[in-house]
Amino acid sequence: MKQILSGMVFLCILLCCVSCTEYTPKPRGYFRIEPPQARYQVLPLDSLPYSFNVSQLAIVELPEIGSPEGWINLSYPSLGVKIYCSYLPVTRSTLQIAENESRSLVSRQAKQAKAIKEQAYSNPDERVYGSLFLLDGESASPVQFMLTDSTSNFFRGALYYDCVPNADSLAPVTDYLRKDIIELIQSFSWKK
């Protein structure tokens, strides 16, 4: 009797294991990303023609030798992100060219983005004027900005991820860095 009962239990277990032909895939999950509280310090480079507050989480990188003067990268290794910043000395005639090129770079990202929101910025006391571009959707560069004094200086920045962008999973990082970029813009000043 025990042998029959043991045989039936073994047969039931065997049937349960091999009878299922439909597999249920597990949904993809993403790591929870919680950026730390933002703390800022003044950009620690006196040789640049501008100054702004930068997150203490960011590492300021100077580009390779031979890169134009005033270019820097703000790297966030713990978040896998860089903000590429470029500076151009301009004249009134080349300022329009720099602004158009900056808008063109934003437009190229619009092919992947659902929408572009532009926010104008003006600080007459520091002679800083510009625009912040927020790109919604699957864009490799969801936040870009440009700043100028409207006479001789032009500064541009673009946020890029070190991975294939997925707007939903990267939303906490994008929001955190958008706030960092807004702090950068609001604290920006020209040294000349």
Stretch-by-stretch model annotation:
Residues 1-9:
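Bacterial N-terminal signal peptides that target proteins for export
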Residues 15-19:
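C-terminal motif of bacterial Sec signal peptides marking the signal peptidase cleavage site
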Residues 21-28:
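Bacterial lipoprotein signal-peptidase II cleavage site
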Residues 28-49:
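Post-signal peptide N-terminal segment of mature Sec-exported envelope proteins
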Residues 48-103:
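Secretory pathway targeting signatures of secreted, lumenal, and periplasmic proteins
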Residues 83-92, 143-145, 167-175:
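Second-shell loop/turn segments in exported
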Residues 100-156:
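Signature of long, low-cysteine stretches enriched in small and polar/charged residues
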Residues 158-192:
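Surface-exposed amphipathic alpha-helical segments
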